[in-house]
A protein has these predicted regions:
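Intrinsically disordered, metal-sensing/regulatory segments
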Residues: 1-259
Length: 259
């Protein structure tokens, strides 16, 4: 196994920890929770719809008629969203989580914990194919692998933030938030290692692009169903909206800078 692609994939995955460290700089608060949820939601939506979707349409457009290409990509995106929604329903509800924070419960902390769990699980699913993609890109062309790792690291940072802030708020422990962010990124090097050991023949370009679209569906669902609603907290609506706007704009700049 070549060392360089694994190193690139590991660094890209661990960049979620940088998002966790950024979250640890400020004490957890409802305002920070709203702003970070909006920021991460903006990044995830923009990365999915302005970066991953056009790439998938361009790839499958080389093999399928336009209508069939669009139908295939939309179907995969929808399947990813449905998968994320189903997994979200399997997690504990806020009432069950609130009971763990004392006899009286704490709805705000319970909601934050559920957001952290849903987002973290979705990112594990999303990061696995990203790790495979980075690994194979680095194996085929080190320069392409470096650009791919840089692009993935760029949106992994706010993803780590999206996990760390609610986790730190729920647990009242910033270190726990950083660790949660790091764990969510470990799926990338894990995906690379498993791909190399067991799945090399399975990961054709068509299959890999399909898994990326599925992962994009997961991100879209998390952004629309979990992060952006959390950003629109009645008391901190402005912070959430500004966070979402900044996330969208920064991700667009990143896409332009790292094609």
């Amino acid at each position: 196994m070549q060392d360089s692609p694994i190193v690139l994939t590991t660094l890209a995955g661990l960049s979620t920890g940088l998002g966790g460290l950024l979250a640890a700089l400020c004490p957890p608060s409802e305002r920070l929770l709203a702003a970070s949820a909006g920021f991460a939601g903006g990044v995830m939506l923009t990365a999915s719809l302005a970066d991953l979707m056009p790439e998938a349409l361009a790839f499958y457009g080389g093999y399928l008629p336009p209508l069939a290409c669009g139908g295939a990509v939309v179907s995969l995106l929808t399947l990813g969203m449905l998968t994320a929604g189903l997994l979200g329903r399997l997690l504990p509800e806020e009432a069950a989580l609130a009971a763990r924070f004392g006899k009286s419960g704490d709805p705000a902390r319970a909601a934050a914990m559920r957001t952290a769990l849903v987002t973290g699980l979705a990112l594990l699913l999303h990061n696995f194919p990203e790790g495979v993609l980075t690994f194979f890109a680095g194996t085929a062309d080190p320069s392409l692998g470096l650009r791919t790792a840089a692009a993935i690291a760029l949106h992994n940072i706010p993803e780590g933030l999206a996990v760390a802030v609610p986790f730190a708020y729920a647990t009242r422990c910033r270190t726990a938030g950083v660790l949660a962010a790091l764990v969510s990124g470990l799926a990338e090097p894990l995906g690379a290692v498993l791909a190399w050991l067991f799945l090399r023949r399975l990961f054709t370009p068509g299959f890999l692009n399909g898994t990326v679209v599925l992962a994009a569906g997961v991100m879209v669902w998390v952004a629309l169903a979990q992060l952006l609603p959390g950003a629109l907290h009645p008391a901190h609506r402005t912070a959430g909206i500004l966070g979402a706007a900044v996330g969208c704009l920064l991700m667009l700049l990143g896409i332009a800078a790292l094609p």
